[in-house]
Amino acid sequence: MRRATTAFNTAVNAAKAEQNITIRKESEGRLACTVSEIAVPNEEVDAVLDRFEFLTTETFTVVDGVTADGKTATDLIRPYGEDAALPVNGILNAATVTDTEDGGKKVVLTFYKDTAALDPNGMSFPKDQSKYIDTLDLLPEENKDRTIVSSAELEYPSTKIYATINADGKLVKMDVVAPIEASAKVVVKNLYVNTRFEAVLRDRYTFTY
């Protein structure tokens, strides 16, 4: 397990250090909400709680360390930060499969099931998952300001990372898949709604060096 985790950390941080790289990122999400109690139903509440799906594709070209809008590979590759350093003690299972055709390898990392609490004072992130993968940041910008979640209990049923590393040790593909289950009290213009969320969120990356 340590070998697989180290291989992933080494490859992802090497990709972040690249001065010239093209990053294709697809973000995909599906969210379903069910209402258990609602004080005053109205159209805005209904709009907020509608099931939504999204798929966005972005391509970033890093030249001499930055994109045209000043971002670096470190800003664009999840898990974010200069040093990913996913800890072995946060991983439930890690497997490496060697690709006999090209000498590369596939790494699959499975995190422990984790929980978090959200209250008006902010989010208490799961120690082994969201510290490295800000799962909620996968939501598209247009949905972030539609609700204010006043309190929530979040459960992360085993987030997974799938990574493909070529024979040269370079990260060429990566999927970050994060299922979420949550019960929450949502505020919409001072209306309180108790609801249940279930979501599957994914970031899929392809790297060209």
Could you say what each language-model-derived stretch is?
Residues 1-209:
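Subset-of-secretome marker
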